[in-house]
Structures are given as structure tokens and as C-alpha cells.
């Protein structure tokens, strides 16, 4: 019992000393896109994401996986990385060959062109807990997953997949390799990435917001647009408000990536002409420290009025100066 206080202190320091990156969930996702136009032409491209950051890419035209971050190798040694990369190189060649054989076997039920997408990786939770996944889509429809120790079709998958799944599950070597990659290699690799990429993963970039409007498809209406850009991480809350009331007609578009790995989002609201008064766009983001951005539509109109006022004042001043000079010249001519 005398060691218990020291054990508790050690545990506390371990938790307290964890970085922010280790105290939130992160999804490590490998995305594979494979196209088969016919029996002699195919290509496979892959990208890898950790949270909102791309860490790797693998073009069909390249024999090796490219790093998109200085820390993309994580804590793996060069030898460990080469071994892992070789495993995927063998997989890519085998995958292409196996799909071509599968199409030959299933013809005429299934024929070219064929599109296959694969999403695999692991979800990392605080405390070193993790959960792996592997999903396969055929012609854009989710059809197969690897669950536990075996391949399974999902509800609604075509019945012709039963035979390939049976063959895959009979290959115990392949199933064991998939389990190892998902349950052991993935969490270990991601922990290294979280440590090596800590500064990038924990960065906070404040959003910039501005307002505009575009014509609406409805007569007598206009569409107000709230633009939000330059923020990281990706989660953000954008809403059109009238006072404290959220405007349920707010439509948020898709997140779009900027070249600097920040994000752009726009929120639109369709309103009747003349009903814009009192509306505001509110933006919440972790980088703002609770100080939300609030842009009032009425305030947007103020600069226009101010510019008109300044122009009118300048015209009056210029007119007065011209009149004064003209009077001076007239008076001078009268003296002469």
C-alpha cells in the first residue's frame, strides 16, 4: 500500500503531460481509388489523412509512397518504413490482378468499366484505445467490410459477392495480415505520427469572415452569403441570426480546402427583399477563445452610405473652391 500514492502520482503525470493531440479523437484513414476501364487498363491512386491533414499520397504512376509532411514517417525507422511500403507494393500488384480475375469469373454479370473504393485505418481515442475499420465500395456502393477476423458483405450487397468473400475468408494468411495491419500496425504508427506531428496537429488558425449577396431563384428574394475562410482545425459553427434566434433556413455548403491546409465554408440564407434588417452571421471556432465573430448585415450597408456622404462633401468643397477662385478673378478684372 505504501507505493499506492506514488503510483497514483505517476498516473496523474502521464495524463497531465499528454499533448492536446493525444487528448482528442483522431481518425487515420487510407483512401484507395481504383478504376478498371477494361482488361488491359487500370489505375490505383491513394491518399492518407490523419484528422484534417493529408500525410501521404501514392500515385498510380509512382512505385513509392510520397510523404506530404516532414513527419509522415512517424517514429518508424527507415528499415521499418521500407518493410511496410514493400508490403503495400505487393498488395497493389496483387489487388489489380485479383480484380481482373474476379471480373473474368463473374462475366457477364459484372463487366467493365469498374470503380472500387477502399477506406481503411483506425480511430484513435485518448488513453491509447483504438478501433480499426476497413470498408469497400463497388461502383460507388458500400458492399464489403472486414470485421473482427473475417470479410463480410453488408446488407443490400449483391449476391454474387458471396463467392469472392468465401474465397477471401479461406485465405487465412491474408486475413491474418489484415488483422495485424489494422489492429497492431495502424495504432502503433499513428501514435508515432501524433507525437512527431504535434505542432501541426495542434495549430489554431483564426477564421476570416465577410458578407455578400447573390440573386435568388425566387422572385422578390435575395440570397445572403456569409463567407468563412482560413480556419483550422476543421470544426466550425456558422449560422445566420436575428437577435438571439438562429435562422433555420441557413444552408451550409461543403467544406473546401485552401492551399495552406486551412478551410473555407459558406452559409447562405434566402430572404425577401427588405427583410435583411437585423440579420447577422455568427461564427464560432476553437481558435477564437470564445470571442465569436458577429457580422451584421446592416453594418455592411453603412460603408456604402458613408462613401456616398464623403463624395457629396467633396463635391461641395470642390464647388466652393471653384466658386471662390472665380469670384477672385472677377474682382481682379473689375479693378483693372
Swiss-Prot record:
<dbReference type="InterPro" id="IPR013783">
    <property type="entry name" value="Ig-like_fold"/>
</dbReference>
<dbReference type="GO" id="GO:0005769">
    <property type="term" value="C:early endosome"/>
</dbReference>
<dbReference type="GO" id="GO:0001865">
    <property type="term" value="P:NK T cell differentiation"/>
</dbReference>
<feature type="domain" description="Ig-like">
    <location>
        <begin position="207"/>
        <end position="297"/>
    </location>
</feature>
<feature type="glycosylation site" description="N-linked (GlcNAc...) asparagine">
    <location>
        <position position="183"/>
    </location>
</feature>
<dbReference type="GO" id="GO:0032729">
    <property type="term" value="P:positive regulation of type II interferon production"/>
</dbReference>
<keyword id="KW-0458">Lysosome</keyword>
<feature type="topological domain" description="Extracellular">
    <location>
        <begin position="22"/>
        <end position="305"/>
    </location>
</feature>
<dbReference type="GO" id="GO:0043032">
    <property type="term" value="P:positive regulation of macrophage activation"/>
</dbReference>
<dbReference type="GO" id="GO:0032743">
    <property type="term" value="P:positive regulation of interleukin-2 production"/>
</dbReference>
<dbReference type="Pfam" id="PF07654">
    <property type="entry name" value="C1-set"/>
</dbReference>
<dbReference type="InterPro" id="IPR050208">
    <property type="entry name" value="MHC_class-I_related"/>
</dbReference>
<dbReference type="GO" id="GO:0045059">
    <property type="term" value="P:positive thymic T cell selection"/>
</dbReference>
<dbReference type="GO" id="GO:0032753">
    <property type="term" value="P:positive regulation of interleukin-4 production"/>
</dbReference>
<feature type="glycosylation site" description="N-linked (GlcNAc...) asparagine">
    <location>
        <position position="60"/>
    </location>
</feature>
<feature type="glycosylation site" description="N-linked (GlcNAc...) asparagine">
    <location>
        <position position="25"/>
    </location>
</feature>
<keyword id="KW-0812">Transmembrane</keyword>
<dbReference type="InterPro" id="IPR003597">
    <property type="entry name" value="Ig_C1-set"/>
</dbReference>
<dbReference type="GO" id="GO:0048007">
    <property type="term" value="P:antigen processing and presentation, exogenous lipid antigen via MHC class Ib"/>
</dbReference>
<dbReference type="InterPro" id="IPR007110">
    <property type="entry name" value="Ig-like_dom"/>
</dbReference>
<keyword id="KW-0391">Immunity</keyword>
<keyword id="KW-0472">Membrane</keyword>
<keyword id="KW-1133">Transmembrane helix</keyword>
<dbReference type="GO" id="GO:0010008">
    <property type="term" value="C:endosome membrane"/>
</dbReference>
<keyword id="KW-1003">Cell membrane</keyword>
<keyword id="KW-0732">Signal</keyword>
<dbReference type="InterPro" id="IPR011162">
    <property type="entry name" value="MHC_I/II-like_Ag-recog"/>
</dbReference>
<feature type="short sequence motif" description="Internalization signal">
    <location>
        <begin position="332"/>
        <end position="335"/>
    </location>
</feature>
<dbReference type="GO" id="GO:0051138">
    <property type="term" value="P:positive regulation of NK T cell differentiation"/>
</dbReference>
<dbReference type="InterPro" id="IPR011161">
    <property type="entry name" value="MHC_I-like_Ag-recog"/>
</dbReference>
<feature type="disulfide bond">
    <location>
        <begin position="122"/>
        <end position="186"/>
    </location>
</feature>
<feature type="topological domain" description="Cytoplasmic">
    <location>
        <begin position="327"/>
        <end position="336"/>
    </location>
</feature>
<dbReference type="InterPro" id="IPR036179">
    <property type="entry name" value="Ig-like_dom_sf"/>
</dbReference>
<feature type="binding site">
    <location>
        <position position="98"/>
    </location>
    <ligand>
        <name>a D-galactosylceramide</name>
    </ligand>
</feature>
<feature type="glycosylation site" description="N-linked (GlcNAc...) asparagine">
    <location>
        <position position="38"/>
    </location>
</feature>
<dbReference type="GO" id="GO:0030883">
    <property type="term" value="F:endogenous lipid antigen binding"/>
</dbReference>
<dbReference type="GO" id="GO:0051135">
    <property type="term" value="P:positive regulation of NK T cell activation"/>
</dbReference>
<keyword id="KW-1015">Disulfide bond</keyword>
<protein>
    <recommendedName>
        <fullName>Antigen-presenting glycoprotein CD1d1</fullName>
    </recommendedName>
</protein>
<dbReference type="GO" id="GO:0009897">
    <property type="term" value="C:external side of plasma membrane"/>
</dbReference>
<keyword id="KW-0399">Innate immunity</keyword>
<feature type="signal peptide">
    <location>
        <begin position="1"/>
        <end position="21"/>
    </location>
</feature>
